[in-house]
Amino acid sequence: MNTKKILSTLLLTALTSVGVNAQHQFTVSTKPGATIQPTMYGIFFEDINFGADGGLYAEMVENRSFEFPDRLMGWNTFGDVTVSDVKPAFDRNPHYVTLANAGHREKRTGLENRGFFGMGLKKGMHYDFTVYARLHTLQGKEAKFRIELIDEEDRPISKATVTVTSNKWQKYTSTLTSDKTVEKGLLRIFLEGSESVDIDHVSLFPADSWQGMRADLVKDLADLHPGIFRFPGGCIVEGTDLATRYQWKNTVGPAENRPLNENRWNYTFPHRMYPNYYQTLGLGFYEFFLLSEKIGAEPLPVLSCGLACQYQNDDNDKNAHVCTADLQPYIDDALDLIEFANGPVTSKWGRLRADMGHPAPFNLKQIGIGNEQWGPLYPERLALFVKQIRAKYPHIKICGSSGPSASGKEFDYGWEQMRRLGVDLVDEHYYMTPDWFLKNAGRYDNYNRTGPKVFAGEYAAHVHGLDKQPTVAMNNFEAALSEAAFMTGLERNADVVYQATYAPLFAHVEGWQWRPDLIWFNNLESVRSVNWYVQMLYATNRGTHVLSLTEGGKPVEGHENLYASAVYDKTAKAYIVKIVNAGDKEQHINLTFTGLKNLGKGKLITLHSNDPRATNSLENKTHVVPQTSDVEAHGNMLSVKVPAKTFAVYRF
């Protein structure tokens, strides 16, 4: 007996049953209300949890340019290997290694690199190897070195030879093909013969990478259908200090010459320290703009306001902030970024964009200044940005911040200052319990409708155990369901909520610092969390206009654990209702669509689990996923029974 199939059928039957004695009478007005922005549901990327190097950025070699403070971190060496920076290939990444003869015919000189928690190799996949090399001496004639992919049993599964014949730096390429699937392989390089050779920028990418990004992770983003893409952070925008802040100009131009930067998250959490966590910036602003275009999302770059991370610095720390008199280079970075994104090819930064391969503008419409700053230091700096951006680019929307908290003195002060400065959007952040999300579904009902709009730039429900630490579950159904309930309030208040992005986006299963996260991955594959499916269902059923949905003249935002919103999609000519039953009992609901005679046939999509701690994992990727069925209304009424712990989307 197929028990799972029977339960699924019973669930769908319950969700669409016709009845006259419903417990709840919902009224949906078919008169279009507030416009829902195309950017309403989106994604936020930050290089945390090895989200960039070791994650979305498909480079498989760690410390490929030997620029980590420990120059050979990530490498095992054998034989005669030395590091040098004399007459380098790249001025901003000057270090390279010399492989010299080991001095005995039975000895080897070489290097091994295990990548990020091992190298994931797939059977039949081609891997593009790149290296810059030269003969070590002017008198040298020919040097050879072997490259091999090695499995967990230390056996080569692919190999090739590179021959170097010049004493000038040149780029060499080769293709390796794995003959088996390996989760934790490595790259081995060793010198053949007696001639010494210098090598730099040792690189290995899967051949199916898109613009240097992992194909599976790009698809995970594209399938969300996001409307907005905020990048590159987050706290890394600020840096541990100003010297390590994220500087976009270091992330454009040839990837080989982008200087290394420390990652803000390498030492943040004592229980999850990663001293080898750096940013090669191979995934830079140009790539972020390309990715935005690829997945159909508006780009929202965030830049430093001149304040280092306020969690890690006191306001009086010497390297914590730049004084306002010296702020102009930071403002110029913002103005130049807009030119890079939108400027003509005759402009300095527009020409660089064209030289990199994209002469057409990226159509940037928004820019964020500062991450989650608080206190008076922030608005006094932001004011200078606002003045100059407004003067030169009046059409660009400016996003400010209300700080790291969802309420309180600093939050109120932040909003007051953002109104005073006249920013277009205010970035709110809240990482709270599922109960908070359920209780705050009406958060925006009474917000001021004039002035800046809300950007819910970072949010996620955090389930805690008795020790107040995140549970073993990476992401679970309880959290996802509470987020779905909360999002009915975002949707209902689309006149004041302009856009929203869940955070964080990515996490390596062996290299995370923070959880929960939307997408988890190892070196071979990824898994979409239950929360991912909530985000996807909202984004693909966004609609263009809010419809009033009420019970007894009031919004449905928690009475008997029910939450609901309704929208109309003008393009698809579709009516869409979202209902969350967060309670422990089934609810019978009649929905009457005023102004319609016949609603007709439609589709029902449900996300349900009886286990609040249910998760999707790499071992069981589809444990909790949406189910779709047909549904039919009777006249202008839809009568449904929504089981406990269910998120349901009705589309007609």
Task: Enumerate the language-model features and the residues they cover.
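Extracellular and organelle-lumenal recognition/adhesion modules and their flexible linkers in secreted
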Residues: Q23-T280, E298-L300, N313-Q328, N371, ...
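Conserved, mostly hydrophobic/aromatic
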Residues: I43, V131, H225, S292, ...
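Surface beta-strand/loop "capping" patches
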Residues: K123-M125, H545-A582
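Solvent-exposed strand-to-loop "edge" motifs in beta-rich extracellular domains
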Residues: Y132-L138, T177, T540, V580-A582, ...
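An active-site-proximal structural segment forming one wall of the substrate-binding cleft
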Residues: D179, G185-L186, P206-P226, L281-L291, ...
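Active-site groove signature of glycoside hydrolases
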Residues: E192, P232-G233, C305, Q310, ...
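Catalytic-core region of carbohydrate-active enzymes that cleave or remodel glycosidic bonds
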Residues: K387-Q388, P394-K397, W415-M418, D424-N541, ...
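C-terminal beta-sandwich/jelly-roll accessory domains of carbohydrate-active enzymes
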Residues: A582-F652
